[in-house]
Amino acid sequence: EAGLPMRVSDEVTVLVWDKLMVNVGINALTAVLKVPNGYLVEHTSSEKLLEYAVREAEKICKAKGIQLKHDPVQHCKDVARATAANYSSMYQDVAKKRITEIDYINGAVVNEGKKLGIPTPVNETLVLLIRAIEEGY
């Protein structure tokens, strides 16, 4: 009744995981490396880290029977390119010495991985790196 367009989706879980994949691949890496989003896809090592983190999360989706709308790595890279000059919210949190949402992003991947018996070493490392930064505030 507010006159706003609305879309009802039976695919809420898919939409949440699609969004999570982008955050998994971009946020912690930009915060640790202290770089804008585009840097991640402009340099080989950071691009590989993005891929590894997202592929770990993708394995969890597959194990849970969640069919994503996009190839998550390509989608994440596309978002990084489209927002190349932007600094992620996690980067901004770290820059301002605020507690981040790491536990709800990469930490969620780690927790789901543990429940499902799926190793998530890259995401676990990213969580520990961000927590180490936060502990220094």
Question: Where are the regions that the model predicts?
Answer:
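NAD(P)-dependent Rossmann-like dehydrogenase/reductase catalytic/cofactor-binding core
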Residues: 51-137
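Active-site/ligand-binding neighborhood in enzyme catalytic cores
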Residues: 25-36, 80, 102-105
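Internal alpha-helical scaffold of NAD(P)-dependent oxidoreductase catalytic cores
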Residues: 1-22, 29-70, 74
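Alpha-helical structural signal
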Residues: 18, 22-25, 29, 87, ...
